[in-house]
Amino acid sequence: MASDQHRPKPRLSLRSSTTIRYGSMSSEHPDGDPSTPQTTSISQRRSYIAVAVLCYINLLNYMDRYTIAGVLLRIQKFFFISDSTSGLLQTVFICSFMFLAPVFGYLGDRYDRKLIMIVGLVMWIVTTLGSSFVRKSHFWVLVATRALVGTGEASYSTIAPTIIGDLFAGSKRTLMISFFYIFIPVGSGLGYIIGATVADATGDWRWALRVSPALGGLGLLLLVFLIPNPPRGASDNGGANMETTSYTEDIKYLLKNRSFVWSSLGVTAMAFVTGALAFWTPTFLSRAQVTQGLKQPCKEEPCDSVDSYIFGAITVVTGVVGVFLGTCISKKLRDRVPNADPLICAVGMLSSSPCFFIAIVLASTSIPATYTFIAIGETLLSLNWAILADILLYVVVPNRRATAEALQIMVCHLLGDAGSPYLIGAISDSLSKYNTTDPSWDFRRLEYSVLLCPFIGVLGGLFFLMTSLYIKEDRKAAELLTSGQTPQPEITTVSESV
């Protein structure tokens, strides 16, 4: 029997072929059997601890991301800035996050993933803490440091899900991924609450930006000592000892993977909606209450933070409930309905859009009704978080997952939440000139701006319906390639080729 070092290794290739759709496993092995699977000595206990640590850091990432939104009114009064300029704070963060995600995706598929995350987390802690010392005359410093914060987060967000994917397989992977993504809404909600609480307690919004870096120091220690670096594809039949391919080949593979493309477009629409609403909802609801005469407008700090508290609590609760429901529904339907996952995502997007539309329209007359429909809409939207991550992991081969995560992040932020907060603010500012005398116009112009979000949500639902048409085929192809087999070519009929 040949020794392992002389055994030929299968290689993923994306060179053009008339028979294979998304790539091939080429091997010189005469019978086509895959190489001996890689094994990993990582215990289940250590794997669970690793997921807990990754969840904790994910929580901190999203806490920091939405702390700014929780104290936005204070920032506007502190720097005397407009809506569009305020939206720029989120846009520059997302832009740096977006453009550097492909870089870290490339590195994550080729180099030590744990080391990359450590470097990124250190950068995030330093820049986040630095942004809290900005002075009133240096708004541009806050903008610059928020951009650098995105650099640190990009390294973590592209790599952490792939490590979970290599520690677990099957339904257990789905469960672990759902735990990881539960902390997106939980962290976001806590960002509003903790940001507003710390700002109220200290009388200075800048102290709110110092909470996440302090907790991040603990996260860094946990990352260094408790996170393993499993072999890529270790949970998927050992990964069949896949060799690294070129970045160009990886991109070609992903662009030919229709489930990945359509689901990425769906994620983009979802990012547009969540990014815009998450950033502007507390400010929007505060202006709605001023219009109804329920409270006085904020002229200078400190501003009333009650809307940040309520919206933060709603985000936490609905996020946990939505992710849990989405995961349970997926596990129950997946075996019977092969395309259940994208269908659940489509239902979540299409049903949440009317809820958000009604909530926006009712804001001028009933705040309780508005909060009710926001809660329903956020629950329906949160059905998608864990499912979307699982879709990417099972339709993409292991040695291209970090690149896939990075490419999806870049696209969804480029066309989604990188521009949506700024776009909403810019539309609101552009409408201000049409009515300069009515005090309620500050609310109305923002209301008309955020009404764009439900329509983008409907578009996202249609993208997920398209994903459902191809998910079964693409998942099977990825499973075959991962196990060292070649996907069977599709039979093309005469009518299809004409």
UniProtKB/Swiss-Prot annotation:
Coiled coil feature spans: none
An annotated GO BP: lipid transport
A Pfam family the protein falls into: MFS_1
Keyword Transmembrane annotated: yes
Family the UniProt entry places it in: Belongs to the major facilitator superfamily. Spinster (TC 2.A.1.49) family.
Name of the featured protein: Protein spinster homolog 3
Disulphide linkage map: none
Origin species: Danio rerio
PANTHER family: PROTEIN SPINSTER HOMOLOG 3 (PTHR23505:SF67), SPINSTER (PTHR23505)
Protein role: Sphingolipid transporter.
GO molecular function list: transmembrane transporter activity
Chief location bin: membrane
Compartments in which it is found: Membrane
Top-level taxonomic group: Eukaryota
Topological relation to the membrane, as annotated: Multi-pass membrane protein
Example of a GO cellular component annotation carried by this entry: membrane
Transmembrane segments: 49-71, 87-107, 114-134, 148-168, 175-195, 207-227, 260-280, 309-329, 343-363, 373-393, 407-427, 451-471
Protein keywords: Lipid transport, Membrane, Transmembrane, Transmembrane helix, Transport
InterPro entries the UniProt entry points to: MFS (IPR011701), MFS_dom (IPR020846), MFS_spinster-like (IPR044770), MFS_trans_sf (IPR036259)
